[in-house]
Amino acid sequence: MPVFMIERQFAEELEAVDAAGLKEINDEESVQWLYSFLSKDKRKTYCLYEAESADAIRAAAERAGIPADVIVEVTQTIQPDGSFSSLP
């Protein structure tokens, strides 16, 4: 399944999320949240997801009432030695 990086900008500091509610929406949209990075000011996240398409991620975000400012499909990682690795 394709992997996407999502950048989310929040107007206020991010607080605890309703993980069960998000999982239910994501399951219905065939989206799997892998993990996220949270900025120091807690107003921006960079999230890694598996989904069939960017549209599925956008639909899940709209239903959950959270932003999905930038959605980019990613296919490889770059290692510290400069080599590229395909995502599993």
Annotate each PLM feature.
Residues 1-27, 39, 43, 54-55, ...:
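Short S/T/G/P-rich N-terminal loop/turn motif that feeds into the first structured element of a domain
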Residues 28-31, 52-77:
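An amphipathic, aromatic/His-enriched active-site/gating alpha helix that lines ligand/cofactor pockets
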Residues 34-38:
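Short, flexible, solvent-exposed loop/turn segments with mixed acidic/basic and small polar residues
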